[in-house]
Amino acid sequence: MKKLLVKELIEQFQDCVNLIDGHTNTSNVIRVPGLKRVVFEMLGLFSSQIGSVAILGKREFGFLSQKTLVEQQQILHNLLKLNPPAIILTKSFTDPTVLLQVNQTYQVPILKTDFFSTELSFTVETYINEQFATVAQIHGVLLEVFGVGVLLTGRSGIGKSECALDLINKNHLFVGDDAIEIYRLGNRLFGRAQEVAKKFMEIRGLGIINVERFYGLQITKQRTEIQLMVNLLSLEKQTTVTFERLGTELKKQRLLGVDLSFYEIPISPGRKTSEIIESAVIDFKLKHSGYNSALDFIENQKAILKRKKDES
């Protein structure tokens, strides 16, 4: 079973999350992803243990503010006795005095942040969900081209890294080379480099290079959403693959249960593979915006044939 310690969460967000109580229990285990709103638990309607981090924000503070001191204490006892691994107080939860008093019995780690609930969802909750996500490892290179996460695949030695280097020289962003960790959040896939290989790339004939040192911090990225998969194939060695000639529809490749848009690009000496990949990304974006070059071409041909027929 995957797990995350509260102290690991605190360390990850030490610049924006402060531990204000429960210092002895930061080894508590977070067993469930996400952040949990706990109004029903505060009302005593649920009695099962809480495995995820609880969040108290504007809604919960407003609810407590309408109660007497004794009622507030009982409500907070209802929550704390369910032993959540930690509780995060948002910026809107402005007065934790009663909570800290009741927590003397339970010593649940209480974290305070200047984030609102929405900001916590995009930062802390996303991080927690990533730790619990199913992770697959795939051999390839991950970049961000024109804002689109592109996973380059292909057999070893076909030139993925060299193609990626060309794209980096065109100011596209580098995420990782060789062993890419891919994880699913909802119906979206994200990718990152393995920790040991982060920032590094192997170029045959040159060796290992540190992309961040060579090209600067601005050219690297920690992770990206994978929207497009491009498989490089040797044109000389392919006898079974029928390559797309018109491109009326986007192919799909399933990865971790998510269908990714997929291109197969033949490579051979003299072909500018990096420019073809840039064109593939533009084609992908245009198709998603509703424009299809192949269909436009077909309609144009039909119009020409019709005009010639009418003239004859």
UniProtKB/Swiss-Prot annotation:
Mg(2+) binds at S161, E202. Its cofactor is Mg(2+). SUPFAM superfamilies: HprK N-terminal domain-like, PEP carboxykinase-like. Keywords: ATP-binding, Carbohydrate metabolism, Kinase, Magnesium, Metal-binding, Multifunctional enzyme, Nucleotide-binding, Serine/threonine-protein kinase, Transferase. Residues 266-271 are annotated as: Important for the catalytic mechanism of dephosphorylation. Gene3D superfamilies: HprK N-terminal domain-like, P-loop containing nucleotide triphosphate hydrolases. It catalyses: [HPr protein]-L-serine + ATP = [HPr protein]-O-phospho-L-serine + ADP + H(+); [HPr protein]-O-phospho-L-serine + phosphate + H(+) = [HPr protein]-L-serine + diphosphate. PANTHER family: HPR KINASE_PHOSPHORYLASE (PTHR30305:SF1), PROTEIN YJDM-RELATED (PTHR30305). This is HPr kinase/phosphorylase. It comes from Mycoplasma pneumoniae (strain ATCC 29342 / M129 / Subtype 1). The gene is hprK.
